[in-house]
């Protein structure tokens, strides 16, 4: 056990030992100890006050007092008062610090703090942080605050159980707070409020003071509106937290510049939010993702995927964002949504696929094509299942087709076209597009199914086609 010596105090010990000795029995938490009260009263004002002997005509040679200190910490302080030496290790340092603060023994206070800062451990960071606030120990407070912010996800349960409004605010307003996105902070504050049953006023103050609303998803914004009981939330122009700040994005940067960075990415959308996933950056495949709200014209952070991806496909389903296939791991699948700590790996596809067509009906995810130019297999994943299953084969291979659900049917269109009906579990042929296409897109405009874009034999197809559900055929769209 490390020993720390107060050399100045040691010089005065000999003089103290020559004074008249008065024995005192101290009853502490967990035991008692007999001390030389004369020496101990010289140590600090606390002991002078608490060991003061009441005046009587016949003084007893031994007095007895009760102190609200644990016996182990008190013993260490008594040994220090006799020898000028204090024994500190990771097991006793926190309790000894608290006892030395209560007893005003400055050498032990600063020695304990220095020991904690040099050999900092996660298991006592929350308690040290609380002491830093309670007793105004600025260096301990600063160090523990930064540590908790950095390890926030690991310490979440301890924080909820122990922190009041002030303790929480100091952590959550930090730029160093290590969270995957700002929605996570909103979800955490709600959990803290429910668990701790704090006053609603504290919750409102916390939301207004710490949430960076300009980086919230629509889901996060709706949660804040619900808390604040309003239709419009406060404006915030703070910089993003360091944990979800993109190193390749300069601030401020407009949406067009951000979109240009995500070259050859996968894209999908939920409402007004477009998700840009993976692609090619700095001459390599990357695992970055970002969301862009084209209504509010701001970007929303997304944590990096578990795997880099090029030629993958994204699809919203089951209130999550799924990313399927692509290089370099064409059978891999993962999912995430705002407020989640990280992407979660899902069951692997039965076949490797790049740029597959993916759609979801009733929370069942269907994957078609993307394997080879002759492959007609399909596979699907049921909610809460851990394995993909083969579905009914398509009539045509769909190596570079696209898929979209329209009118309770799953349309699969590229060079050829067909649709899937879930109730009958069958594919039905429809007329091929007027202009066959590779990698086109299907969109819905005014309750019409439109086929746009794509390439054929190296040329871009700029003609838009509209589906006629009466004739099962395609017509050139005139914009009406």
UniProtKB/Swiss-Prot annotation:
Residue span(s) of domain BACK: 125-223
Q: Which SMART domains match?
A: BACK, Kelch
Does Repeat show up as a keyword for this record? yes
PROSITE patterns per the UniProt record, alphabetical? BTB
Entry keywords, A to Z? Kelch repeat, Repeat
Q: Where is the BTB domain?
A: 10-90
Q: What induces it?
A: Expressed in the early phase of the viral replicative cycle.
| Pfam families in alphabetical order | BACK, BTB, Kelch_1
Q: Where are the Kelch repeats?
A: 273-319, 320-363, 365-408, 410-447, 448-480
Q: Name the job this protein performs.
A: Might have a role in the suppression of host immune response.
Family assignment from sequence similarity: Belongs to the orthopoxvirus OPG047 family.
Q: What is this protein called?
A: Immune evasion protein OPG047
Q: What taxonomic classification does the UniProt entry list for its organism?
A: Viruses, Varidnaviria, Bamfordvirae, Nucleocytoviricota, Pokkesviricetes
């Amino acid at each position: 056990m490390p020993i720390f010596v107060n050399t100045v105090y040691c010089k005065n010990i000999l003089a103290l030992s020559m004074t008249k000795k008065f024995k005192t029995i101290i009853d502490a938490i967990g035991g008692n100890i007999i001390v030389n009260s004369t020496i101990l009263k010289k140590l600090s004002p606390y002991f002078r006050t608490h060991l003061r002997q009441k005046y009587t005509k016949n003084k007893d040679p031994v007095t007895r007092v009760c102190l609200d200190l644990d016996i182990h910490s008190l013993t260490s302080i008594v040994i220090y008062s006799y020898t000028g030496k204090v024994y500190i290790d990771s097991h006793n340092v926190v309790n000894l610090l608290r006892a030395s603060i209560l007893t005003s023994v400055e050498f032990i206070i600063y020695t304990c703090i220095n020991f904690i800062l040099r050999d900092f451990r996660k298991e006592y960071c929350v308690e040290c942080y609380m002491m830093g606030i309670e007793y105004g120990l600025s260096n301990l407070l600063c160090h523990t605050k930064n540590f908790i912010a950095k390890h926030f996800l690991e310490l979440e349960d301890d924080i909820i159980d122990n922190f009041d409004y002030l303790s929480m605010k100091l952590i959550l307003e930090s730029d160093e707070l290590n969270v995957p996105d700002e929605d996570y902070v909103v979800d955490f504050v709600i959990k803290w409020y429910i668990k701790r049953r704090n006053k609603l006023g504290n919750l409102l103050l916390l939301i207004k003071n710490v949430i960076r609303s300009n980086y919230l998803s629509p889901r996060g914004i709706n949660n804040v509106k619900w808390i604040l009981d309003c239709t419009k939330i406060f404006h915030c122009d703070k910089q993003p937290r360091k944990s979800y700040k993109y190193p390749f994005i300069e601030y401020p940067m407009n949406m067009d510049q951000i979109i240009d960075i995500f070259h050859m990415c996968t894209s999908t959308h939920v409402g007004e939010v477009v998700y840009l996933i993976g692609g090619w950056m700095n001459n390599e495949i990357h695992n970055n993702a970002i969301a862009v709200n084209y209504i509010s014209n701001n970007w929303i952070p997304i944590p990096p995927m578990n795997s880099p991806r090029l030629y993958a496909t994204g699809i919203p389903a089951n209130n999550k964002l799924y990313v399927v296939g692509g290089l370099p791991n064409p059978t891999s699948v993962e999912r995430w949504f705002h407020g989640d700590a990280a992407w979660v790996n899902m069951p692997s596809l039965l076949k490797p696929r790049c740029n597959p067509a993916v759609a979801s009906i009733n929370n069942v995810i269907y994957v078609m094509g993307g394997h080879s130019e002759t492959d007609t297999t399909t596979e699907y994943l049921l909610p809460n299942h851990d394995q993909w299953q083969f579905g009914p084969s398509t009539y045509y291979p769909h190596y570079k087709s696209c898929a979209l659900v329209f009118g309770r049917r799953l349309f699969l269109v590229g060079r050829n076209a067909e649709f899937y009906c879930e109730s009958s579990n069958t594919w039905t042929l429809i007329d091929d597009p007027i202009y066959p296409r590779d990698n086109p897109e299907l969109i819905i405009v005014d309750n019409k199914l439109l086929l746009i874009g794509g390439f054929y034999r190296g040329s871009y197809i700029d003609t838009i086609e509209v589906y006629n559900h009466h004739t099962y055929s395609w017509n050139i769209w005139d914009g009406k």
